[in-house]
């Protein structure tokens, strides 16, 4: 199943209830290099909380969890350049062979881009390495 590699139930237990109530919460941080939880992160109550990530708009969360849904679009070339700069050539190979195709299949299967009211188009890295 596209997007099936995420533990949505844990998100529903640890994060969603507090988001709905505007309360502080803690969640377990998953370390993909160890394939295990690696501590917790505390999130204070705030007037605005951003939930980001490739799978954060899965239909599992279509029950009014978010006030605004935004899609961050990036060209394949810019995406690969950023992965290479951030993670190195070996990781880029893994991303190209596994993670990018999985994310693309998920986004297409569930119409993620089309379900968003806001589209943010990434710009290529500038001379200073800055990007939007």
Question: Each PLM stretch: what is its role?
Answer:
Residues 1-43, 48:
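Conserved nucleotide-sensing/catalytic segment adjacent to the nucleotide-binding pocket
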Residues 1-6, 93-101:
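A short acidic, glycine-rich active-site loop
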Residues 10, 14, 79-82, 98:
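Alpha-helical scaffold elements adjacent to nucleotide-binding pockets in ATP/GTP-utilizing enzyme cores
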Residues 17, 85-88:
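Short, intrinsically disordered, mixed-charge
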Residues 22-25, 90-95:
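Short, basic, glycine/proline-bearing loop/turn elements
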Residues 36-86:
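ATP-dependent NMP and nucleoside kinases share a basic, alpha-helical "lid"
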Residues 63, 68, 72, 77, ...:
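NTP-dependent small-molecule kinase module
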């Amino acid at each position: 199943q596209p997007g099936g590699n995420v533990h949505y139930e844990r998100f529903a237990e640890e994060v969603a209830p507090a988001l709905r109530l505007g309360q502080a919460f803690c969640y377990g941080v998953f370390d993909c290099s160890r394939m295990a939880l690696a501590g917790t992160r505390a999130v204070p109550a705030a007037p605005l909380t951003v939930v980001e990530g490739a799978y954060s708009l899965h239909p599992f969360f279509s029950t009014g969890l978010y006030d605004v849904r935004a899609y961050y679009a990036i060209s394949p070339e810019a995406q690969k350049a950023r992965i290479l700069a951030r993670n190195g050539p070996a990781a880029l190979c893994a991303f190209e062979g596994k993670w990018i195709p999985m994310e693309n299949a998920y986004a297409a299967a569930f119409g993620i881009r089309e379900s968003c009211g806001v589209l943010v188009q990434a710009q290529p890295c500038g001379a200073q390495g800055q990007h939007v």
